[in-house]
């Protein structure tokens, strides 16, 4: 060892700055070149894998097993730590002066470092300790391995031992390790093939040795003979040293040294002959070379990549086994998968086999690129705090990012800088632009040459010139100010000296620019070119240019910096440039840190991640040093090391040669733990390298790449986000913490995470406060169905790919395919279909029925084939031409088997993802089959199947798929079978004469259709016909095949004329686009969505707020209509409707067309009377189903006029009650038996909302002037004009100008007949007809006791509107179907203008009301108030406007327990009615508020009193309604009419009998509801005049007595306890006047309000405003009693 050590100085083996300790602990050491003899040697890190030298036999660098001592010397045998240091020097002498200041080194030292005293030469320390250096290295094996072009040939990983935590601060400067080597190497000219540098031949090596001296203590020691000896040695070498030249050994006898730092006392070295003569280029950061090239290591087996991305999709996994499992989904086709014996190469990550290394390498690069993307995005996601918005203090000038954290802002700014720096760095560092770097371009003036010192005031850096100092200041110290200027740091690197750290920074920035953006390190690629082993002989022959070098973009284009070549890894956050001073022939390692990126504070604090030790040449004498990079980029220990080393050199009395050697050999050592997977990856890569690596275009600063994660820590998400260098090398996808999804980009992950958090109601900014487990648990609980669906839709066979049967387009999700199918259907003109049927299935059926020349057989069987068992899957056959087999669950059953059958409708073959969907679908079938109570009779699926089994499938009756239709050859069988007790009997269409049967028959069951169940080819087809296809004229064909949604449409439209025509009627109605018609008012809609919204409006008007039937407002409205219709079986026995047969025919054949959603009359359940009545020739019902468009609600109801009729059926005649509960026989409170099936208006039943009337499409007529309008919107605008003329500016009734006008007309004109509507005579006949069995079918006015509807004459289709209210459709005017007066067909659209009056009557009243708008009771008062005054009728307070009065009235009503404004939705009117019906309470209240003084209404008390005298004050409830209800009892009706005439509003204007019966039947129902029975009921028995009178009376009754403005007083005290309570969806409503409680869903309030209304109405009887009122009320009551 003496001889060895005598040759030169050995650097102390203690760690240098922070690096030394890491070097020692990691077992890595940087080898340095030795003296002039071995100037260009590159010392490669050695990874110790057990007893094996990883370089041995793999990289071609080491030629044998490491010395046995190495295995013991290494701290851990399983870890490999690499430390690379480069040795180069210039010829200048290096003089170290003790205590020389650090400024001329790498910058200031952090105060936190424990720097004790100046560093002394190792020999001095050694001497002081009394331990000769030779003794220290007795057991050392000195190994110097030279790896030329390592920088170009692959990357090595620098791995710190797992679990080792490097605290660099704890090492004192005395522990810095320096290796000073002198070596004489091969002779002959050396050629740098990498950089094409021709270097002079090196003199023969005098000695080959390395001396490593490790200072043990911090105690200063004087130099001893060891030092002198070393100096002598150095001097000896000085003779042969050629520091300006770099050369590689060219003979195998040359010696390379591998240095292993074993501990703080010594280093293990081994001398080895070089394997082959190789030439090396200028020094390039070997650290990055190692990273890029990778060191073949077995540790990859021990430490797998933390992220395993799938290259087929954007998913990555934490564990390899998961990726392998996942990759099974991407399994290549059998033909693509090479045989195992022929594919020896397999991807270690995903297991794919390859026959060629090139293919494997390319495949691996995909993995790497994926990892890089993941890392990049995770860096972005984690590194930068969330955007705090524009309110933040710091705002980014380039984007909308804002934050209050300066650190976060700086980090964010780096993002912009990263994007901008690469281009500059790529183009400017080497402007020569030549593909091959010329040394001349890298020549920098020697520091020693610089004349004049310019010292940086910030860091003490001395620049050779002011310009360089300015540049230094701008680059190094201006990073906080302007990130954008950072790029300029690299503008002219060739013109300015740089520190070694600067050199590090420059090239690597460009080299590693895109490390995170899917780039494979260039060097790594080169190294990977020969995965079997790196052979320097092959790669670097004397004249051989390294393979792949020509492919490096850097070398090929001047746009790339040299560093790019050498530093593909994140470690290369420093760029390296080579300077050759032609005068001094020096090559300077320059490291220029990326000025744009500072180490974060944590990075500075935690030097454990990366140790940066700067190595550069410097001349203390002249103080010329390259510009400093950002000080924060260099760990303080490194800077301190430089200073101490400088001091030591100055103290050492070394020869000039030694000084020079030492001067050029202070290395920058980057210590970082790199995962072995990267090394393994590089070695696995195939030799082929893509011609260009375009990804390596952006710069990643050192601070960005070398973040502060513990090197030994696991590579978790935090590590990834914090930028662990090891992580930086991994192309990791980011995993969502809440689910297995992985993302390449941080933005995608962030958005995904936001989705998770939003679903659980957590803000993204506070996501750290809720654990991932909590989020997962919440999502599992509340989003299970969604996730389940998503999983269910995943088709592993096609990797979640679903294909369109029509065009073969693939989709990842069923939702996407469904949307796509809708587009196809729209192309086919099919825009409507049953909501419960999937568009995918519809398209499938459509294709199945139209694909083959022969119409496809129904889903159930082949055409003509034997019927299959009902339960067999009857999916439509896919067309033979279908490009791809269906992949979704709705595909033909065979594909999915029994499991699918569980969610497949056996009737029509429609598939559903859940049983819930199938259940809803089954209900639609049951409804179509006329099973009205299916929703409450248990499982609809089982019920449907049972029904079908028992009865067989109807002939394409319900829009069911042909399978169902075929199933039952005769509808009779289908209908005959007894359904469940709860089920409505399905009448045979054949029995149309039997009205009940006809009505009950499903819409699709026309008599003919039933008769020809399966004979019709259409039936065989998928029953859905294309919207555009002509409808068959045959009633048979009319059965809606797939019109699952009962939309009234023309029967023709429903059925294709021929099988070839529309195969499937996808729309519920015959005309999917237009024939979706409201059953209540007959209005057409483009699709079910519009109809649904429209139905909701009807229901709301009726007071129904919950869609209890299948959750569908359409079905609910239909059900209400049906139940109302059914509930009046005892109505007029001979309503003037079409003959039962005709009616049945219309209803049954109309099928879907007849109802809102192709509902049959049976669904509507029109009262049998109506059904039985022969339809008048012109009656809509009389129209043959085929001749006329499918019956709409108008057709079905007398109130609805058929399209053929010039006027729609009088809506007035139809009365709909929403409340099932209210009606005895129906779910919604069907009319009491006592009520006439048609004639008895059910005011109680009528929803309080007067505006509930349906809105006819064309027959919307103004009640005031009789003008028709296309829609309610036009009428509303028109009504506003009337109201403005009247001085009314607020629509007090339901906020609707139409209702307000109607109410005003009603209240003001007791003689509503003034209207231009059909003469009273016409109306009377209509009413009479209604009441009489001979009532015209068109006048099927259900005695909608929808006084509110009636009150809204402005709304066309008043009848229909009323129908929704009462939903019991009874023909009010039967004798005159279409001629019956305005209420005739036109009336269809118009609800009864007055609550219970026919439109004409109402209109007449309206006119009168118009004249007396302000005197009208509530509305009138409102109107009058709005125009003249707003005074509270109860307390006499005056208000500025009606709005204030309404608010005041609401307070009164709430005090009295009334929470629903049942009268026209107006609290003012409701209060007025309440006052009339509760005179005693009113009196008591007035007395109370006035202190016992009599209450007097100054203004209208008299007028109102008179009015009230004339009419029963809301006695309508019993009396008024009874009057109206009494179709025969003229007097009651007349009285009601008179009441209306008297100006009082007939609240319960429905036919007296009806009203009374309803009242009696349902005490809960408010009798003064707007839906007063149409006078039509009463008028049915009388002449038009009587009807008019009756209507007038009713109006009078409804109109509250003139309001007497009470003396202003305080609002009365509210009830002691709340009347309304609700828990969840269950409401408990108490009656303010009695002990009755109502419990149920929100819709229960309808009953409650009616009940309250009844009380309110009753109050009027006891004490009406004037006494005459009371007598009227009793009369009305009597009439009502008689009416039944």
UniProtKB/Swiss-Prot annotation:
The modification Phosphoserine is found at residues 1029, 1039, 1045, 1050, 1058, 1112, 1139, 1155, 1160, 1167, 1179, 1184, 1296, 1342, 1347, 1550. It is found in: Nucleus. Residues 13-24, 1556-1574 have a biased composition (Basic and acidic residues). It comes from the Eukaryota. Residues 1599-1611 have a biased composition (Pro residues). PROSITE patterns: ZINC_FINGER_C2H2_1 (PS00028), ZINC_FINGER_C2H2_2 (PS50157). Residues 1063-1067 are annotated as: Interaction with CTBP1 and CTBP2 1. A zinc finger (C2H2-type) spans 308-330, 345-367, 454-477, 734-756, 802-824, 903-925, 1076-1098, 1260-1282, 1430-1452, 1629-1655. There is a cross-link at residue 1556 (Glycyl lysine isopeptide (Lys-Gly) (interchain with G-Cter in SUMO1)). Residues 1335-1351, 1672-1684 have a biased composition (Low complexity). Residues 1040-1057 have a biased composition (Polar residues). It holds the Pfam family zf-WIZ. The modification N6,N6,N6-trimethyllysine is found at residue 1195. The keyword Ligase does not apply. InterPro entries: Transcr_Reg_ZincFinger, Wiz_C_Znf, Znf_C2H2_sf, Znf_C2H2_type. Changing residue 1651 to A: Impairs interaction with EHMT1 and EHMT2. There is a cross-link at residues 916, 972, 988, 1000, 1021, 1033, 1038, 1089, 1141, 1145, 1171-1172, 1210, 1273, 1315, 1376, 1389, 1403, 1405, 1415, 1481, 1497, 1510, 1556, 1567, 1593, 1663 (Glycyl lysine isopeptide (Lys-Gly) (interchain with G-Cter in SUMO2)). Residues 1247-1251 are annotated as: Interaction with CTBP1 and CTBP2 2. The keyword Zinc applies. The modification N6,N6-dimethyllysine is found at residue 1195. Part of a complex containing at least CDYL, REST, WIZ, SETB1, EHMT1 and EHMT2. Interacts with EHMT1, EHMT2, CTBP1 and CTBP2. The C2H2-type zinc finger 10 mediates interaction with EHMT1 and EHMT2. May link EHMT1 and EHMT2 histone methyltransferases to the CTBP corepressor machinery. May be involved in EHMT1-EHMT2 heterodimer formation and stabilization. Belongs to the krueppel C2H2-type zinc-finger protein family. This is Protein Wiz. It comes from Mus musculus.
């Amino acid at each position: 060892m003496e001889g060895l050590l005598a040759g030169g100085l050995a650097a102390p083996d203690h760690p240098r700055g922070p690096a030394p300790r890491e070097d020692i602990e990691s077992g890595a050491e940087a080898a340095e070149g030795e003296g002039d003899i071995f100037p260009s040697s590159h010392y490669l890190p050695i990874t110790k894998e057990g007893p094996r030298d990883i370089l041995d036999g793999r990289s071609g660098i080491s030629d044998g097993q490491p010395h046995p001592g190495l295995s013991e010397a290494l701290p851990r045998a399983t870890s490999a730590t690499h430390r690379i240091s480069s040795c180069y020097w210039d010829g200048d002498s290096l003089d170290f002066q003790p205590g020389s200041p650090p400024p001329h080194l790498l910058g200031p030292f952090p105060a936190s470092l424990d720097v004790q005293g100046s560093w002394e030469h190792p020999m001095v320390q050694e001497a002081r300790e009394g331990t000769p250096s030779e003794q220290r290295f007795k057991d050392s094996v000195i190994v110097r391995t030279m790896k030329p072009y390592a920088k170009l040939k692959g990357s090595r990983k620098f791995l710190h031992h797992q679990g080792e935590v490097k605290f660099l601060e704890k090492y004192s400067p005395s522990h810095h390790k320096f290796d000073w080597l002198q070596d004489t190497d091969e002779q002959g000219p050396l050629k740098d093939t990498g950089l094409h540098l021709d270097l002079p031949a090196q003199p023969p090596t005098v000695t080959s040795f390395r001396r490593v001296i490790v200072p043990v203590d911090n105690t200063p020691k004087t130099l001893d003979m060891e030092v002198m000896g070393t100096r002598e040695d150095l001097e000896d070498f000085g003779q042969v040293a050629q520091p300006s030249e770099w050369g590689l050994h060219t003979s195998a006898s040359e010696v390379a040294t591998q240095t292993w730092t074993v501990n703080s006392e010594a280093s293990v070295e081994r001398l080895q002959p070089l394997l082959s003569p190789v030439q090396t280029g200028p020094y390039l950061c070997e650290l990055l070379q190692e990273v890029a090239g990778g060191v073949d290591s077995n540790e990859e087996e021990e430490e797998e990549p933390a992220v395993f991305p799938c290259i087929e999709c954007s998913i990555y996994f934490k564990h390899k086994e998961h990726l392998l499992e996942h990759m099974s989904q991407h399994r290549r086709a059998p033909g693509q998968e090479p045989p195992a014996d022929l594919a020896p190469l397999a991807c270690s990550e995903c297991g794919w086999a390859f026959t060629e290394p090139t293919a494997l390498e390319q495949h691996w690069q995909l993995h790497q690129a994926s990892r890089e993307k993941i890392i990049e995005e995770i860096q972005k996601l984690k590194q930068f705090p969330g955007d705090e918005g524009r309110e933040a203090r710091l705002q980014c000038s380039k984007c909308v990012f804002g934050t209050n954290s300066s650190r976060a802002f700086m980090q964010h700014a780096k993002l912009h800088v990263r994007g901008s720096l690469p281009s500059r760095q790529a183009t400017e560092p080497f402007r020569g632009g030549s593909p091959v770097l010329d040394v001349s371009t890298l020549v920098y003036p020697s520091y020693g040459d610089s004349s004049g010192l310019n010292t940086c005031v910030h860091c003490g850096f001395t620049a050779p010139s002011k310009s360089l100092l300015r540049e230094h200041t701008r680059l190094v110290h201006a990073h906080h100010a302007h990130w954008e200027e950072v790029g300029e740091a690299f503008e002219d690197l060739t013109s300015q000296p740089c520190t070694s750290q600067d050199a590090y920074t420059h090239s690597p920035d460009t080299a590693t620019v895109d490390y995170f953006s899917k780039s494979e390190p260039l060097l790594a690629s080169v190294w990977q070119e020969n995965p079997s082993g790196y052979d320097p002989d092959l790669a670097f022959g004397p004249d051989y240019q390294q393979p792949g070098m020509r492919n490096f973009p850097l070398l090929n284009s001047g746009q790339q910096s040299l560093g790019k070549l050498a530093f593909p890894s994140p470690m290369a956050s420093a760029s390296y440039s080579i300077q050759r001073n032609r005068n001094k022939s020096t090559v300077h390692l320059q490291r220029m840190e990326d000025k744009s990126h500072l180490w974060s504070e944590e990075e500075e604090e935690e030097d454990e991640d990366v140790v940066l030790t700067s190595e550069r040449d410097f001349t203390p004498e002249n103080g010329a040093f390259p510009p400093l990079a950002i000080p924060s980029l260099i760990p303080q220990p490194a800077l301190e090391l430089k200073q101490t080393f400088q001091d030591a050199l100055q103290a050492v009395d070394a020869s000039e040669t030694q000084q020079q050697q030492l001067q050029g050999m202070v290395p920058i050592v980057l210590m970082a733990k790199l995962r072995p997977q990267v090394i393994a990856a590089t070695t696995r890569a195939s030799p082929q390298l893509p011609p260009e690596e375009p990804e390596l275009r952006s710069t990643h600063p050192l601070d960005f790449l070398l973040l502060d994660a513990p090197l030994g820590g696991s590579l978790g998400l935090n590590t990834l986000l914090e930028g662990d260098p090891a992580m930086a090398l991994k192309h990791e996808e980011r995993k969502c913490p809440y689910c297995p999804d992985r993302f390449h980009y941080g933005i995608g992950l962030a958005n995904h995470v936001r989705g998770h958090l939003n679903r659980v109601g957590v803000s993204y900014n506070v996501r750290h406060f809720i654990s991932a487990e909590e989020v997962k648990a919440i999502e599992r609980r509340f989003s299970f169905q969604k996730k389940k669906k998503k999983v269910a839709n995943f088709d592993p066979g096609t990797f979640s790919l679903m294909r369109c049967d029509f065009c073969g387009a693939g989709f990842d999700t069923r939702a996407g395919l469904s949307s796509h199918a809708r587009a196809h259907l729209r192309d086919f003109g099919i825009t409507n279909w049953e909501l419960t049927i999937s568009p995918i299935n519809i398209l499938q059926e459509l294709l199945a029925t139209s694909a083959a020349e022969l119409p496809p057989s129904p889903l159930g069987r082949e055409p003509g084939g034997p019927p299959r068992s009902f339960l067999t899957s009857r999916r439509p056959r896919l067309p033979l031409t279908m490009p791809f087999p269906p992949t979704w669950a709705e595909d033909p059953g065979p594909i999915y088997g029994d499991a699918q059958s569980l969610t497949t409708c056996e009737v029509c073959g429609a598939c559903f993802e859940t049983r819930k969907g199938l259940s809803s679908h089954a209900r639609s079938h049951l409804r179509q089959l006329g099973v009205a109570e299916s929703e409450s009779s248990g499982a609809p699926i089982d019920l449907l199947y049972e029904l079908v089994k028992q009865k067989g499938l109807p002939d394409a009756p319900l829009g069911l798929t042909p399978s169902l239709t075929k199933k039952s050859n005769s509808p009779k069988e289908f209908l005959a079978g007894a359904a469940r007790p709860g089920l409505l009997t399905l009448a045979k269409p054949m029995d149309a004469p039997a009205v009940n049967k006809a009505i009950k028959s499903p819409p699709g069951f026309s008599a003919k259709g039933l008769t020809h169940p399966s004979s019709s080819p259409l039936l065989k087809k998928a029953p859905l016909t294309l919207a555009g296809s002509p409808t068959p004229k045959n009633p048979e064909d009319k059965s809606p095949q797939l019109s699952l949604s009962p939309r009234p449409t023309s029967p023709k439209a429903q059925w294709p004329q021929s099988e070839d025509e529309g195969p499937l009627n996808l729309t519920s109605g015959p005309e999917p686009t237009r024939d979706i018609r409201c059953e209540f008012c007959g209005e057409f809609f483009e699709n079910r969505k519009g109809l649904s919204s429209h139905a909701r409006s009807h229901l709301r008007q009726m007071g129904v707020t919950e869609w209890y039937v299948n959750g569908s407002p359409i079905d609910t409205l239909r059900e209400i209509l049906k139940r109302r219709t059914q509930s009046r079986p005892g109505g007029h026995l001979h309503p003037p409707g079409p003959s039962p047969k005709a009616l049945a025919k219309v209803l049954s054949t109309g099928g879907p067309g007849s109802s809102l959603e192709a509902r049959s009359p049976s669904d509507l359940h029109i009262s049998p009377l109506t059904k039985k009545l022969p339809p008048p020739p012109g009656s809509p019902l009389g129209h043959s189903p085929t001749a006329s468009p499918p019956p709409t609600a108008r057709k079905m109801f007398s109130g609805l006029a058929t399209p053929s009729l010039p006027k729609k059926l009088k809506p007035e005649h139809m009365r709909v009650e929403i409340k099932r509960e209210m009606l005895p026989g129906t779910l919604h409170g069907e009319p009491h038996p006592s009520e006439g099936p048609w004639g008895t208006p059910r005011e109680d039943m009528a929803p309080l909302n007067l505006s509930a009337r349906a809105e006819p499409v064309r027959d919307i007529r103004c009640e005031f002037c009789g003008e028709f309008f296309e829609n309610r919107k036009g009428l509303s605008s028109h009504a506003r004009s009337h109201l403005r003329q009247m001085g009314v500016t607020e629509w007090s009734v339901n906020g609707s100008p139409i209702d307000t006008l109607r109410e005003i007309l009603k209240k003001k004109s007791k003689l509503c007949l003034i209207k231009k509507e059909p003469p009273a005579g016409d109306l009377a006949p209509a009413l009479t007809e209604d009441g009489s069995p001979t009532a015209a079918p068109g006048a099927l006015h259900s005695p909608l006791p929808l006084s509110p509807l009636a009150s809204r004459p402005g709304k066309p289709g008043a009848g229909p509107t009323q129908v929704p209210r009462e939903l019991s459709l009874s023909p009010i005017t039967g004798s005159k179907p279409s001629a019956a007066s305005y209420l005739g067909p036109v009336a269809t659209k118009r609800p009864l203008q007055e609550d219970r009056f026919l439109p004409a009557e109402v209109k007449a009243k309206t006119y009168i009301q118009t004249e007396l708008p302000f005197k009208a009771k509530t509305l009138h008062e409102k109107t009058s108030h709005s125009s003249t005054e707003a005074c509270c009728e109860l307390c006499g307070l005056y208000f500025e406007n009606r709005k204030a009065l309404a608010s005041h009235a609401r307070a009164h009503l709430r005090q009295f327990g009334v929470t629903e404004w049942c009268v026209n939705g107006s609290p003012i009117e409701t209060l007025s009615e309440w006052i009339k019906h509760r005179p005693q309470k009113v009196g008591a209240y007035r007395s109370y508020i006035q202190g016992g003084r009599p209450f007097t209404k100054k203004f209208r008390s008299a007028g109102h009193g008179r009015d009230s005298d004339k009419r029963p004050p809301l006695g309508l409830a019993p009396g008024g309604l009874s009057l109206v209800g009494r179709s025969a009892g003229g007097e009651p009706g007349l009285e009601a009419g008179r009441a209306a005439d008297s100006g009082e509003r007939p609240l319960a204007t429905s036919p007296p009998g009806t009203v009374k019966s309803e009242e009696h039947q349902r005490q809960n129902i408010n009798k003064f509801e707007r839906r007063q029975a149409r006078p039509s009921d009463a008028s049915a028995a009388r002449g038009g005049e009587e009807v008019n009178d009756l209507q007038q009376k009713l109006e009078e009754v409804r109109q509250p007595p003139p309001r007497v403005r009470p003396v202003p007083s305080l609002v009365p005290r509210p009830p002691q306890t709340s009347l309304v309570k609700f828990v969840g969806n269950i409401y408990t409503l108490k009656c303010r006047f009695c002990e009755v409680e109502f419990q149920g869903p929100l819709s229960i309030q309808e009953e409650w309000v009616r009940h309250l209304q009844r009380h309110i109405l009753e109050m009027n009887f006891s004490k009406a405003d004037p006494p005459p009122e009371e007598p009227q009320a009793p009369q009305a009551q009597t009439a009502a009693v008689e009416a039944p």
